[in-house]
Amino acid sequence: MEPRAAVLKLIEHKHLTTLEAESFMNHVMKGEVSEILLSSFLTAMRFNGESVEEVLGCTLALRKNALRPKTVFPFDLLDTCGTGGDGQGTINISTLSAIVLASLGIKVAKHGNRSVSSHTGSSDILTRLGYQTETTQEEVEAHLVNRGFTFLFAPMWHPSMKHAGPVRKELGFRTVFNMIGPLSNPFSPQFQIIGVYQPELMELFIKVLQSLGLKRALVCHSRDGLDEFSIFQITDYTFLENGVISRHSFDPKILGLSSLNKEEVYASSSDHAEVLARKVLNSESIAGTHAVALNAGAGLFVMGKIDTIEQGYQIAKEAILSGKTKKYFEDLISKE
């Protein structure tokens, strides 16, 4: 299907098939679609509501046009990249939980970018903490093999996205591009935990992950609006295991937490976000420790290392409080 025909179909309030969406996005990635046509495509799709097939097709195109690793990794990989954009301004919980997971021996290929809606994105906070995020492809792959953690800076691994950049910036609203980024890790991890900015996206994302063939994956959104597991409110999540999707809720009351200070997990500026992140790594933040441990625990659950998220939380919390995670991260950045 030609790009113009795809836009006309969307304008008629019809959804594209996976192949049609993939074809259009392939043209975009090659710089063959005008800004006017791309703007029309993104706007019409947003008005219709992105379907599973459309998100899957766009994801396949982005993956196809990404740089590919030269290394064949002989181990299971996890990514904790979320959509961002929940507008809550929390500390970088998914990034910190990725560090905790790596300190526990999980191989983490963290896919990410600069800030979407928070004061600091995953790239921003890692840089502030001393980890170099913009390195060569060879270094990124070597870090994963030798250290168990690596960061894939999205603009470097998805150079074809430059063709969509000006239109995305000009439109200024969320489009399908905000969805396909977390689904397009170039290392193709078979295990993934994704926090989403709207509860309606949990079903869509888990079905896309199912179509992509992941072994185990979890998509979550908390009832207080976070794109991660919350220590203050119930978190709903969809779960994929061996091709089967199930739906669940996690109530943090089961952890027995009380008198938590929300100010320890909500940042007012980039500098404040860094201060709060360091407090977590230094075991100086009660609420921050619980929040990061809970999300790391969910990662352990996705990896199949424990039977329940609660068990994972206890293991992750001990890693933080014992200084294990701090030592791991200090060793990690000392080799930069």
UniProtKB/Swiss-Prot annotation:
Pathway: Amino-acid biosynthesis; L-tryptophan biosynthesis; L-tryptophan from chorismate: step 2/5. Mg(2+) 2 binds at residues 227-228. Mg(2+) 1 binds at residues 94, 228. It comes from the Bacteria. Gene3D superfamilies: Nucleoside phosphorylase/phosphoribosyltransferase catalytic domain (3.40.1030.10), Transferase, Pyrimidine Nucleoside Phosphorylase, Chain C (1.20.970.10). The keyword Amino-acid biosynthesis applies. Binds 2 magnesium ions per monomer. It catalyses: N-(5-phospho-beta-D-ribosyl)anthranilate + diphosphate = 5-phospho-alpha-D-ribose 1-diphosphate + anthranilate. InterPro entries: Anthranilate_Pribosyl_Tfrase, Glycosyl_Trfase_fam3, Glycosyl_Trfase_fam3_N_dom, Glycosyl_Trfase_fam3_N_dom_sf, Nuc_phospho_transferase. Anthranilate 1 binds at residues 82, 113. Its EC number is 2.4.2.18. The keyword Oxidoreductase does not apply. One of its GO terms (molecular function) is anthranilate phosphoribosyltransferase activity. Its cofactor is Mg(2+). 5-phospho-alpha-D-ribose 1-diphosphate binds at residues 82, 85-86, 90, 92-95, 110-118, 122. Anthranilate 2 binds at residue 168. One of its GO terms (biological process) is L-tryptophan biosynthetic process. Keywords: Amino-acid biosynthesis, Aromatic amino acid biosynthesis, Glycosyltransferase, Magnesium, Metal-binding, Transferase, Tryptophan biosynthesis. GO terms for cellular component: cytosol. PANTHER family: ANTHRANILATE PHOSPHORIBOSYLTRANSFERASE. Homodimer. Belongs to the anthranilate phosphoribosyltransferase family. HAMAP family: TrpD. Catalyzes the transfer of the phosphoribosyl group of 5-phosphorylribose-1-pyrophosphate (PRPP) to anthranilate to yield N-(5'-phosphoribosyl)-anthranilate (PRA). This is Anthranilate phosphoribosyltransferase. It comes from Leptospira interrogans serogroup Icterohaemorrhagiae serovar Lai (strain 56601).
